[in-house]
Amino acid sequence: MSVRTRWLLLACAAAILVGHSLVYNFVTDDAYISFVYSRNFAEHGELSFNLGHPVEGYTNFSWTVLLGLFMLIKIPPEISSRVLGTLCALGTLWLTFRIVTRALGDKSPWAVVAPILLACSSGFACWTSGGLETQLFTVLVTGALDALVAACERPRAIRRMGVLLAFASMTRPEGPLVAVAFGAARYIQCLVTTRRWLPGKDELYAAAWFLGLWGPWFAWRWWYYGYPFPNTYYVKASGDWVNPAMADEMVAQGYYYLRVWLTQTRLVYMLPFAAIGLAAPDARTPRFALTFGCALLALVYLPYAVSVGGDFMGLHRFIMPMFVIAAIAVVLGLETVFGRWPRVAAAVVVVTVLAFAVTQIDLTRTSTLSCAHRDFAHGPDHCVADHGVIDTPAFLMVYTEDRATIGRAMKDCFRPDDFSILGGAGAQPYFAEMRGIDVFGLVSDTIAHGDPRSRARAGHTKWGSQANLAAYDPTFVFSCYKLHDTPTPPPLGCGWAGFEPITMHIPGLLEQGEYYTFLAKKSRHFDCPGRVK
């Protein structure tokens, strides 16, 4: 295949991905948590959710700071995050193309197949949008894999792997896990090919770059926030269980999360080819570096994902680097089996890509069907949490849009000394510019370190106790709420002494009606345009 044709097909993959991601074109509620930190960083020089009380309720330092820098030039994060996510995803397509080219040769037509598969993937396209750091982390990991492969022929290339993995580790907490996998892959390959037990100069430089960048940052954030790990770790993966059986439930949910990934991506049908693709007997070749690095990463990353229960967001943003690994492995497997017969190989590739695209078109369609005005307890499957745990993109979209609408409508109703207990610390506090903490404890060190794990759901294992929540002396309790379609509020099913239910009419709410009932302290004498009296 000519160079021109390969680049033309890569450009087609890029166009497919951009169009595919625009079908989703949303920002999920969790992204707005980082946006609050970005705004406080840009406007006040503080990486905190509530000014004056730094709590590390985010795990994406580099992404949060980057969005904050764009806010300094008046570009809002709900725009910059989507543009940057798309650019990072396009970078991943190019790096994947380059990686396969390194492994199979400059003229190999197989190099364009993996980017096309990624562009067609519903999960990859969904989280190209979404507003999260997912694609920044993925492009950094893919860049590190490219450096690992390139180092077979140019040993100095391994140095940039250390730099990229340092930034990856400042973007997602799984970064050090990737560093261990790729570092082990490089060390073992060198050991097998050179019989040298000690790392070489280039490997030492790579380690120095990693530690020199990541180490000072780790020390700074420990000093700044007071704990060695992010607050989200203590909320999601630390502490005793109220019921010890919940630990097993989390692992079972992790296996289910992995199974859904295998079935939705149709990778379950291509596992034999992926296994064949990850076999490379000659340890001196770039192909061995690629397949060994991919295999080691999968062996540590997937069990880790299972151990924490997977994720509560649909379409697998939590294991996005595995999309790249899977695409590469499948392509290498197909090349191994059919590569000697070019015409057969071409037919197999066309059929594989078209069949995959058809399944992903249907998945994207169902993932983006509107959930407006639905009763989610009895509604269609695309609006109900899968297995009671994994929220669909369709639900995430309508949930976030409603919280953004509430925040905008109530922004001018808050006083500087008001404090809120929130159900989600995302779009609602971002647009309302309110102070508060979420009942799950993501931005509360009190809940993170003071409450046990009581819910077997990924990312939401803790729920603030009444005593710990009351210690904040809140003015509003938004975690106790109802959305409804008539002015008369239904029973809330929860209550606080000294608080009263408040009902607001907020035009534009989509989920279950335009009326929103929550709790406010009676002594606040709360009034706001739109209050139903």
Label the model's feature ranges.
Residues 1-533:
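Membrane-proximal envelope and lipid/glycan-remodeling enzymes
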